[in-house]
């Protein structure tokens, strides 16, 4: 859906053929209907949480990141982190391939803005590369988990008081 929608956004931002835009809108509408049917099926199982629709994730990014940002996963990466925070998941691991500068810009660059919107968000960016030492990756995740535990303990103390 992201790639189809990117074509529509490109035409809005830079111009393009109206027929191409209409075809993309039809495809996006079709994918949206499929996504809604998946979500309807998932809703009946208590073991799963229904994911937000593509349209909702796109709406979350409005004013945070531009739709023309397509570096790495572009605005979608930011939208997914915002959706997780909105759903109550405060501890988020943003994994990205090592050396992918576009993902660093899209991922790490938006972490502060996400924390401004949702102060409880505890986000860590972890780079994965076949040659990178696992210790660094594991330590970053452990640090995020320890901060998460501290936040949980502080919340529990507030409830008890």
Annotate each language-model stretch with its function.
Residues 1-161:
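An N-terminal assembly and electron-transfer interface module characteristic of large anaerobic redox
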